[in-house]
């Protein structure tokens, strides 16, 4: 898979300084691109080659001239060495002639071993005997003292265990490599043999034909071909070839990395071009590179499986690695950047408060590694090493998504949204009010670039990005209040009343407060809490009411304490509130479960209201739909779920199912509720 990176970056000069978002043109971002190599899915989009400027061409020409000068100096030095007197005398010595031994035949089972593998394994007893012999040989006191210390060390149990581990690893490392397959079409070969044997009537030929037709042999040949096909796709790279290739990079620190990569596990690394070099830009969580811990950001790739990489375009690197699996041998120049060892990162779970599509984002480092999500999705963030681009999985996709995806970091998203809002305010004239938008008197304010460290109120009120979440399972004796939200005539009041009527022992409503006088048949504490206007206004000032209003010069309201009384009784508190009350409710300790009751299509809504004997005008229906959009846009981050009320009976059953699920399954709630 090919991914391209248009590196719109955020500069952070210090904690106290203003952070700026680079909103450069897409053409400018074409110069800074990454490509993710060997990633899952048919997502490859080729990257247009980057045109080098005249300055870059001059630098490249200078590098080529320096290389040629080094080659000429090396040849001159070699000529000087070849002309030395000592080499001339050595050249006059006749070469030694070997003797042919006709009695030696390697085909009779004797295998010549390379001196590289002829390693003698020393046992602990041999080491002890050697030290004893040395102790008797050396007579001075200092040597005797040193030998005594060594003997004590050899007799130590920990040393003996370490010695055994060393020997075991040595034996394993010097084992011969497994045999390399000669063919990958054993099945075809067996079929060809059977064709040849058809006209043959010898007993041995018939036995061989019957043997090749047995299910076990056919299964064996099939397995052989599958394994051989995988092994033969990559030519084995021997140590001699690797070390021979390193010689051309003399003077540079080079490391060799071998990674075992299965066919179904992507490599999980992005690369970029820096002049002729191919540099590892990013290591993605979940890939073979991250699991091995051997590739690092900033490493320059010189070779992969003996193929030279320096000078190649990232598209060529993508094509090269597209189908590679098995043992990958990298020759690298390690990054010069000294990074502290990565701390063990804690996974955080966040709820997204905005929609994101990486294909529409010109600043995503790796477009095809970008993770799309919708408002309300839960993301599991596993890496914040790059503060601008987090690595995350979407809830429910962990098993189907081998690599983590890239999502905008919270600070980065807040910064560019603030910049967009500033630009839009400068460009757009004040519009006339619409059905869903009341006019506001804009206060004059000093325009400053957004600073995440100083504008907490600005974040919370205007720029919604992510909210950290935790799983919460409600206790059996402390039920979460159920809040129904929706525009008028969408059925939330009918659904609430049906629940109250059908299951009176399970659901209850909070007793409201009022300043009006008690009427006959009304019971204080059951129908209303009757209080004075002065006490009511004092409670408003103290923030004790979830919502309140005035009707016929009397104040009415629902208090947090009234809801808490229902919860303490063991029942489920049912409330139907306005959206303006949600912030106060969420900031309380009540842990509400908020369900948005949305209307169906305009035609279906007209039919539902007609059943109730209502005949709304077309503009009234449009106003309900627009009000729904406004509520979702401005308050959707408060909603836990939504129900489209296209049929009241079905909506009731769905509402009951969601409420019952709170007893059996943990739910995601803001982490601040559990602290």
Swiss-Prot record:
Membrane topology, record value: Peripheral membrane protein
One of the record's GO cellular component terms: axon
SH3 domain location: 345-417
Positions that bind ATP: 486-493
Annotated PDZ domain residues: 256-336
GO MF annotations in UniProt: ATP binding
InterPro entries named among the record's database cross-references: GK/Ca_channel_bsu, Guanylate_kin-like_dom, Guanylate_kinase_CS, L27_C, L27_dom, L27_dom_sf, L27_N, MAGUK
Domain named Guanylate kinase-like: residues: 479-660
Keyword hit for Zinc-finger: no
Biological processes, Gene Ontology terms: central nervous system neuron development; cerebral cortex development; regulation of transforming growth factor beta receptor signaling pathway
Magnesium is among the record's keywords: no
Keyword list, A-Z: ATP-binding, Cell junction, Cell membrane, Cell projection, Golgi apparatus, Membrane, Nucleotide-binding, Phosphoprotein, Repeat, SH3 domain, Tight junction
Domain L27 positions: 120-177, 179-235
Highest taxon, organism lineage: Eukaryota
Region span, Interaction with LIN7C: 181-243
Localization terms from the record: Golgi apparatus; Cell membrane; Endomembrane system; Cell junction, Tight junction
Residue ranges of the region described as Interaction with PARD6B: 21-140
Region Disordered, residue ranges: 1-34, 51-78
Phosphoserine modifications at: 14, 25, 83-84
Region (Required for the correct localization of PALS1 and PATJ at cell-cell contacts and the normal formation of tight junctions and adherens junctions): 1-345
Gene3D superfamilies: 2.30.42.10, L27 domain, P-loop containing nucleotide triphosphate hydrolases, SH3 Domains
Protein role: Plays a role in tight junction biogenesis and in the establishment of cell polarity in epithelial cells. Also involved in adherens junction biogenesis by ensuring correct localization of the exocyst complex protein EXOC4/SEC8 which allows trafficking of adherens junction structural component CDH1 to the cell surface. Plays a role through its interaction with CDH5 in vascular lumen formation and endothelial membrane polarity. Required during embryonic and postnatal retinal development.
Domain notes: The L27 domain 1 functions in targeting to the tight junctions by binding to and stabilizing PATJ.
Family to which this protein belongs: Belongs to the MAGUK family.
Subunit structure: Heterodimer with MPP1. Forms a heterotrimeric complex composed of PALS1, LIN7B and PATJ; the N-terminal L27 domain of PALS1 interacts with the L27 domain of PATJ and the C-terminal L27 domain of PALS1 interacts with the L27 domain of LIN7B. Component of a complex composed of PALS1, CRB1 and MPP4. Component of a complex whose core is composed of ARHGAP17, AMOT, PALS1, PATJ and PARD3/PAR3. Component of a complex composed of PALS1, CRB1 and EPB41L5. Within the complex, interacts (via HOOK domain) with EPB41L5 (via FERM domain), and interacts with CRB1 (via intracellular domain).
Protein name from the UniProt record: Protein PALS1
Gene: PALS1
């Amino acid at each position: 898979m090919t991914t391209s990176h248009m590196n719109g970056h955020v500069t952070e000069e210090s904690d106290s300084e203003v952070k700026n978002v680079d909103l450069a043109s897409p053409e400018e971002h074409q110069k800074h691109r990454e490509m993710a190599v060997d990633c899952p899915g048919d997502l490859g989009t080729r990257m247009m080659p980057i045109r080098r400027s005249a300055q870059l061409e001059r630098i490249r020409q200078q590098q080529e001239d320096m290389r040629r000068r080094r080659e000429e100096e090396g040849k001159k030095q070699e000529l000087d060495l070849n002309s030395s007197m000592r080499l001339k005398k050595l050249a006059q010595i006749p070469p030694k002639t070997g003797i042919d031994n006709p009695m030696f035949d390697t085909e009779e089972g004797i295998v010549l071993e390379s001196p590289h593998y002829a390693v003698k394994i020393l046992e602990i007893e041999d080491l002890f005997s050697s030290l004893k012999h040395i102790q008797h040989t050396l007579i001075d006191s200092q040597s005797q003292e040193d030998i005594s210390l060594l003997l004590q060390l050899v007799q130590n149990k920990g040393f003996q265990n370490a010695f055994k581990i060393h020997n075991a690893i040595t034996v394993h490392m010097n084992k011969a490599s497994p045999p390399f397959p000669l063919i990958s079409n054993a099945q075809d070969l067996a079929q060809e043999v059977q064709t040849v044997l058809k006209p043959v009537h010898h007993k041995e030929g018939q036995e061989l034909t019957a043997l090749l037709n047995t299910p076990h042999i056919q299964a064996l040949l099939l397995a052989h071909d599958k394994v051989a096909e995988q092994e033969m796709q990559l030519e084995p790279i021997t140590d001699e070839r690797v070390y021979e290739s390193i010689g051309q990079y003399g003077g540079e620190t080079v490391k060799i990395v071998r990674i075992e990569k299965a066919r179904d596990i992507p490599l999980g690394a992005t690369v970029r071009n820096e002049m002729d070099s191919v540099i590892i830009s990013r290591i993605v969580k979940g890939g073979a590179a991250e699991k091995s811990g051997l590739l690092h950001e900033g490493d320059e790739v010189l070779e992969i499986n003996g193929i030279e990489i320096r000078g190649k375009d990232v598209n060529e690197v993508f094509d090269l690695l597209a189908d590679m699996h098995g043992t990958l041998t990298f020759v690298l120049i390690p990054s010069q950047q000294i990074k502290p060892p990565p701390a063990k990162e804690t996974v955080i779970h966040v709820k997204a408060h905005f929609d994101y599509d990486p294909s529409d984002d010109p600043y995503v480092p790796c477009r095809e590694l970008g993770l799309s999500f919708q408002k309300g999705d839960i993301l599991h963030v596993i890496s914040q090493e790059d503060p601008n681009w987090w690595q995350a999985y979407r809830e429910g996709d962990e098993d189907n998504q081998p690599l983590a995806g890239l999502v905008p970091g919270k600070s980065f998203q807040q910064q560019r949204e603030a910049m967009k809002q500033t630009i839009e305010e400068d460009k757009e004239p004040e519009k006339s009010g619409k059905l869903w938008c009341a006019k506001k008197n804009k206060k004059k304010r000093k325009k400053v670039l957004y600073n995440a460290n100083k504008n907490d109120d600005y974040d919370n009120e205007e720029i919604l990005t992510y909210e950290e979440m935790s799983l919460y399972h409600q206790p059996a004796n402390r039920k979460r209040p159920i809040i129904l939200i929706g525009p008028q005539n969408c059925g939330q009041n009918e659904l609430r009343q049906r629940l109250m009527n059908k299951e009176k022992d399970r659901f209850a409503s909070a007793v409201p407060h009022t300043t009006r006088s008690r009427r006959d048949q009304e019971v204080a504490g059951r129908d209303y809490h009757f209080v004075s206007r002065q006490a009511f206004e004092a409670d408003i000032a103290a923030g004790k009411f979830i919502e309140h209003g005035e009707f016929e010069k009397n104040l009415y309201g629902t208090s947090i304490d009234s809801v808490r009384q229902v919860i303490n009784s063991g029942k489920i508190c049912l409330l139907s509130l306005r959206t303006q009350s949600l912030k106060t409710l969420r900031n309380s300790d009540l842990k509400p479960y908020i369900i948005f009751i949305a209307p169906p299509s305009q035609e279906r809504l007209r039919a539902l209201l007609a059943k109730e004997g209502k005949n709304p005008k077309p503009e009234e229906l449009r106003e309900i739909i627009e009000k729904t959009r406004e509520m979702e846009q401005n308050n959707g981050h408060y909603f836990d779920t939504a129900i489209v009320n296209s049929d009241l009976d079905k909506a009731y059953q769905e509402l009951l199912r969601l409420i019952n699920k709170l007893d059996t399954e943990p739910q995601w709630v803001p982490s601040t509720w559990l602290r």
